[in-house]
Amino acid sequence: MRLPRLLFVFIASSLVVAGCADESPPPPVPAVLSFDDGWGQVFVANLDGSGLRQVTPTVGDVSSDSRYASSAAVSPDGTQLAYTRGGRFIELVDLDSGETRTVHEGGYQPVFSPDGARIAFSSGGGISIMNTDGSDVRVVATGDSGFGAAFSPDGSRVIFNVGGYIVEAPADGGQSKVILRDQFWNADPSYSPDGSTLVFSSNRGGNNGSEIYSVLVGGGDITPLTDTHAVHPKFTPDGSRILYTRATTLSGEAVVDISTANRSELASMIPDGSDQKRLTPRSITAEMPSIGGGL
């Protein structure tokens, strides 16, 4: 009677193993890059710039068309896109089906939390956070000048710009604290995926423009990463590169003085500022990168 029992246990164990193998998680969605063209259209592409496609409708009159789209953000899993429509509606797009719905009225510059469950955004009341479906809207930092929010890697805090200062607040509400305050205009704060480094744009170069800088979280020397006009830094999900917007001439030369620029493009660099290279084609203007998926 012993052998059949052992045989039964062996068969049952094999079925459990086989079942686990069949239930392995699906492969991750490839990394998705989003940006807007500064003229009311939002695009997505692969992280190397290939596979470019327009996600939002083509806008006629940029000054009055309610479909004007800007400030897009890709969800962490790369399946959804949030963006601002008409300067006041937050829209959510399924990147596979193309289905679009309005999840909030009265906000702009949406950004996803690291787990994809919440969206932080700017509004007349300050920085707010809501569930991805638009429910449970909460103001976490008051003041009508707060904008450009980004979550910390663990989702517990949001960092943003208030009048040229970089400020951080608990994502569940609480006392805000100033992270960087000096005589310069500092904006576009964003954390590295491991939370060790903060990147931001600032006019501290004194060249009638803005450059990208990095500083260790907790303090330390501020390190310049670009010496030409650049804004909107964002780390790739694996932390290996920083994507950003840079200003150029019509011929594609990066400029120092913003008054000499004719267009914008996306570029990428290694986090120490080296290996700077154009990412988007010269046939289109591009700004405000966001990255999701790929992990």
Residue ranges and their predicted role:
Residues C20-L295:
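Sequence signature of WD/YWTD-type beta-propeller architectures
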Residues M1-A18:
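Sec-dependent bacterial lipoprotein signal peptides
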